[in-house]
């Protein structure tokens, strides 16, 4: 009796294995062709050891289990988000040698090491977006001992100006400030030049009135306090994104509603931080598909997928990259690309951190040490701006 039970379980196991193989091959064929998969075509390509009738029977069971749905026009089967989840969990990263060579050549655009960490991460995200032809975002902690290297003033209208601070590590800080009155022609440029020289401790290269100098220092001190406050007291990682227009090349995103859902999700800082941080200590990519994203954002099925992967300095995760695309992504190629990409980035970041003795901070939303007093902010920030006494 026990032998019969064991044989029955063995036959069931073999059948499940065959059904699993049919499902994986059907998804693979669908990803390659973009067309609904029929039993005859699947037999001719990947399942020659099975009859068309057997494949149809397996298709019927997979439909019942929610992995496939029937296309009413062609009669073929289309994978569901549950099927893509199964495929993402069971497929291995695969890249052709030619693809590996192209990726490695692209990654040579990144430096061997650099102090300009944020700028290099932004460059890396541009490269990854170009390779995958997909939108990419990444999270970043705050790096210590940064220095403001440049100041720019951009006029919006007669009474408003955009103040732009750029730092040695590639950070950008912008804010809109109000002017007390309309400035004469070229006055703003003279103030900008004065502040750039002041920042570098150089004598002013252009003559300006005492009124212009006083206004320049007022604007400077105001934006410094705002910058230090934001730098020291932040509740979320910094997020950067690129390549959103690349979604338009995919058929599913040509529908305005689907495109809007995908973009709104990708641009939602709270949701993206939640995804990027959820598997920060897992070195392999993590995939969120279809309804799994809907559970997070709390609205209709966005019909898209997000793949996240952390990036490391030595054995310490610094942040994560996220890739947005349709559910029918070429998962094997994406996983393989992300593996090469993060390994290269890990080497660069590790060398940079040890060479320049860099450090970083995580968000601290309730840290009582993050005082709002300007002098205290200056002491805590590790940002080279003004001495504390000039801010009190």
Swiss-Prot record:
Keywords recorded for this protein, A-Z: Repressor, Stress response, Transcription, Transcription regulation
Pfam family, one: HrcA
Membrane-crossing segments per the record: none
Origin superkingdom: Bacteria
GO annotation, biological process: negative regulation of DNA-templated transcription
Record-level Gene Ontology MF annotations: DNA binding
Free-text function comment from the UniProt entry: Negative regulator of class I heat shock genes (grpE-dnaK-dnaJ and groELS operons). Prevents heat-shock induction of these operons.
PANTHER family recorded: HEAT-INDUCIBLE TRANSCRIPTION REPRESSOR HRCA (PTHR34824:SF1)
Record-stated family: Belongs to the HrcA family.
Entry protein name: Heat-inducible transcription repressor HrcA
Species per Swiss-Prot/TrEMBL record: Chlamydia muridarum (strain MoPn / Nigg)
Lineage: Bacteria, Pseudomonadati, Chlamydiota, Chlamydiia, Chlamydiales
GN (gene name): hrcA
């Amino acid at each position: 009796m026990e032998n019969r039970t064991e044989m029955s379980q063995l036959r069931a196991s073999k059948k499940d294995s065959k059904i699993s193989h049919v499902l994986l091959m059907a998804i693979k064929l669908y990803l390659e062709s973009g067309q609904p998969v029929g039993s005859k075509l699947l037999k001719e390509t990947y399942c020659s050891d099975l009859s068309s009738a057997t494949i149809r029977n397996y298709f019927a069971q997979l439909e019942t289990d929610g992995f496939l749905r029937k296309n009413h026009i062609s009669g073929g089967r289309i994978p569901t988000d549950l099927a893509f989840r199964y495929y993402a969990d069971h497929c291995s990263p695969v890249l052709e040698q030619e693809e590996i060579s192209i990726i490695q050549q692209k990654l040579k655009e990144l430096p061997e090491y650099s102090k300009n960490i944020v700028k290099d991460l932004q460059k890396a995200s541009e490269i990854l977006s170009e390779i995958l032809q997909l939108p990419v975002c990444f999270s970043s902690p705050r790096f210590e001992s940064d220095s403001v290297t440049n100041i720019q003033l951009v006029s919006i209208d007669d009474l408003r100006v955009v103040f732009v601070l750029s730092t040695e590590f590639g950070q950008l800080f912008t804010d809109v400030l109000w002017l007390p009155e309309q400035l004469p022609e070229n006055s703003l440029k003279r103030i900008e030049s004065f502040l750039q020289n002041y920042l570098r401790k150089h004598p002013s290269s252009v003559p300006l009135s005492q009124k212009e100098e006083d206004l320049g220092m007022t604007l400077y001190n105001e934006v410094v306090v705002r910058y230090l406050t934001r730098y020291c007291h932040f509740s979320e990682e910094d997020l950067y994104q690129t390549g959103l227009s690349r979604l338009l090349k995919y058929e599913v995103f040509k529908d305005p509603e689907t495109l809007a859902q995908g973009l709104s999700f990708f641009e939602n800082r709270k949701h993206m931080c939640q995804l990027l941080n959820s598997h920060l200590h897992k070195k392999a990519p993590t995939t969120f598909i279809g309804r799994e994203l809907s559970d997070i954002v709390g609205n209709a099925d966005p019909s898209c997928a997000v793949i996240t992967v952390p990036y490391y300095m030595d054995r310490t995760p610094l942040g994560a990259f996220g890739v947005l695309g349709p559910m029918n992504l070429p998962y094997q190629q994406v996983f393989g690309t992300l593996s090469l990409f993060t390994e290269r980035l890990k080497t660069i970041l590790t060398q940079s951190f040890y060479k320049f003795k860099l450090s970083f901070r995580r968000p601290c939303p309730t840290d009582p040490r993050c005082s709002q007093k300007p002098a205290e902010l200056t002491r805590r920030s590790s940002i080279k701006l003004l001495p504390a006494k000039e801010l009190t």
